């Protein structure tokens, strides 16, 4: 098994490697990058900051040209080694093979008929790359002494992958050979391709992802040069930005949670072979068998011989798929647009509204979502908007009135309006909000559709335009839904229709209908909806605090260093707490589901 010449230094065109750069010159550039990435951008200056950070990164990449490690041969040449390695280590020996599916990339193809719910793929723990295997590897000594590696499992996995890639005798080499040499995440976009996302709801996550990655790279470059525990790492003499970008993307597109060996907690892992499966709509069909100590996957549906085998990655939005997985899923039943909403602390009724929201289990400032289907808002967002639009008398009724405790259960139930006027206000707000958000885009939906018809459009440009078009379509549907609901309730008010009243006996209805669950049960599919907005972002939220007068939204996400000292030679250059916070923001959505990985 294996190829004669496994690893080589990357060729840099006809010119080969660049002229040697002095360590001092490189360290000066790295220090400048670290300093730039460790401060928060001023509101509205996020793009300008991105351009500056990218400029520094490109200077570093130019000086590192020719120093990155790649493998001989094509990726496809190594798939037979991957299958043989899996069989040798207790994995499946038949039923599927790795195949090229054109625009979908590589995936798994059935080599026989497979029945729905049939166990067709299993991966023993010894094949997995995990945080535990990293701690037991050459990376262990540095991991035990570095706070960032300890706090961020995804970064630990990235370094584990780099260290094993640099070791020709690594037991995971057949898996590492099978990984793509480049990805389609925004970390690989050209600046003009990222620019296509300006004005979208996704742009801030894209910019933060790049900034966090650059900051981590600069921090660890300095650490590898100065920390005694790094002296034996194979990365010490060659650690390029391209290498780190590749490792981060490999982990970001593939990381999954599995139990530790004792089953006591969940840790991040890379799952060879299984992560070749592409995504489709459906249900989670993968789990971990603690008794047999292996990851197991059953078929999502019946598959005929030669058909592609799909799995369901989870309820991700297309923004999450593009940013964290590098693809756009056209028929995404779970697509949505994130919006940050909050009750202004300067509002006269803030305390009363915050109290009603608190009783319903909803923060006064939170992240919600507008969905691609009907209704466009969740029960939690409906409850928030109802409270936001309440008059003082309505607030008193929900705080002190007869049956106040029971009424909290109705806030997210569309069948029990607070009042016709309240419904008109909240749907008017949704209509206005969606219209304002649509005005922030630089192109129309029709213009985006025309652009997507161009045959010479780059893949990354296509992803960016598909994503911004999908956002607009969700907002357009929300606007139309808001208008229809507003007109409906205006008619109810005009007709003086009787208002449905909640009775204690209605609790059975609330508890037995998935769409009418009491808000306090917090049963939400999307992990990000309803998260409390951190205090450092509340000042920004004041700028777009749901005022019904149509105030335009500001789109910055603050990152604030707290000035805490760092360790070793990196002291004073970067705030570790800020770094941890930034990376958690970019990884939060990828580390919480069983089947969140890339489409090949």
Language model features by range: what are they?
Residues 145-161, 338-341, 349:
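E2/UBC-UEV (E2-variant) core
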Residues 139-140:
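Signal peptide-directed extracytoplasmic domains
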Residues 2-127, 132-135, 163-600:
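Long, positively charged leader/targeting segments at protein N-termini
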């Amino acid at each position: 098994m294996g190829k004669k010449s496994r690893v080589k230094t990357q060729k840099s065109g006809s010119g080969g490697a660049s002229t040697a750069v002095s360590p001092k010159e490189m360290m000066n550039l790295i220090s400048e990058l670290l300093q730039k990435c460790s401060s928060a951008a001023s509101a509205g200056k996020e793009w300008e900051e991105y351009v500056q950070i990218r400029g520094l990164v490109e200077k570093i990449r130019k000086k590192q040209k020719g120093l990155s490690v790649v493998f001989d041969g094509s990726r496809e040449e190594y798939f037979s080694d991957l299958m043989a390695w899996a069989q040798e280590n207790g994995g499946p020996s038949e039923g599927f093979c790795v195949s090229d599916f054109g625009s979908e990339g590589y995936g798994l193809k059935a080599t026989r008929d497979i029945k729905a719910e049939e166990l067709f793929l299993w991966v023993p723990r010894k094949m997995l790359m995990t945080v535990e295997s990293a701690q037991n590897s050459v990376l262990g000594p540095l991991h035990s002494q570095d706070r960032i590696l300890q706090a961020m499992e995804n970064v630990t996995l990235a370094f584990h992958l780099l260290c094993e890639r640099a070791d020709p005798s690594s037991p995971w080499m057949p898996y590492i050979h099978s990984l793509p040499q480049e990805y389609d995440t925004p970390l690989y976009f050209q600046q003009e391709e990222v620019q296509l996302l300006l004005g979208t709801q996704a742009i801030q996550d894209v910019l933060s992802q790049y900034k966090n990655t650059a900051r981590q790279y600069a921090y660890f470059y300095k650490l590898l040069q100065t920390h005694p525990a790094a002296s034996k790492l194979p990365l010490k003499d060659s650690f390029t930005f391209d290498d780190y970008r590749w490792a981060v993307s490999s982990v970001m597109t593939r990381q999954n949670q599995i139990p530790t060996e004792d089953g006591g907690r969940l840790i991040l892992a890379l799952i060879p072979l299984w992560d070749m499966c592409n995504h489709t709509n459906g249900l989670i069909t993968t789990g971990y068998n603690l008794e047999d100590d292996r990851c197991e996957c059953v078929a999502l549906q019946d598959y005929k011989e030669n058909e592609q085998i799909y799995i369901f990655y989870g309820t991700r939005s297309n923004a999450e798929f593009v940013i964290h997985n590098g693809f756009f899923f056209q028929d995404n039943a779970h697509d949505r647009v994130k919006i940050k909403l909050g009750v202004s602390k300067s509002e006269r009724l803030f305390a009363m509204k915050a109290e009603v929201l608190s009783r319903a289990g909803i923060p006064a400032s939170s992240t919600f979502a507008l969905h691609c289907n009907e209704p466009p808002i969740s029960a939690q967002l409906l409850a928030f908007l109802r409270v936001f639009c309440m008059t003082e008398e309505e607030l008193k009724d929900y705080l002190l009135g007869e049956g106040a405790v029971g009424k909290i259960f109705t806030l997210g139930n569309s069948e029990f309006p607070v009042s016709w006027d309240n419904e008109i206000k909240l749907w008017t707000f949704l209509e206005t909000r969606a219209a304002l958000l649509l005005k922030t885009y630089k192109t129309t939906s029709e213009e985006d559709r025309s652009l997507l018809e161009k045959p010479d459009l780059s893949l990354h440009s296509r992803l960016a335009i598909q994503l911004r078009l999908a956002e607009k379509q969700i907002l357009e549907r929300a606007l139309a839904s808001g208008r229809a609901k507003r007109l409906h309730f205006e008619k109810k008010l005009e007709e003086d229709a009787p208002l449905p009243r909640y009775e204690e006996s209605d609790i059975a209805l609330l508890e037995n209908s998935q769409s009418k669950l009491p808000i306090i049960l917090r049963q939400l599919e999307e992990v990000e909806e309803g998260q409390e907005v951190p205090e450092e972002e509340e000042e920004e939220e004041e700028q777009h605090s749901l005022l019904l007068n149509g105030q335009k939204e500001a789109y910055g996400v603050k990152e604030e260093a707290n000035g805490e000292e760092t360790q070793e030679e990196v002291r004073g250059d970067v705030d570790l707490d800020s770094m941890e916070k930034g990376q958690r923001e970019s990884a939060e959505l990828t580390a919480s589901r069983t089947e969140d990985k890339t489409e090949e």
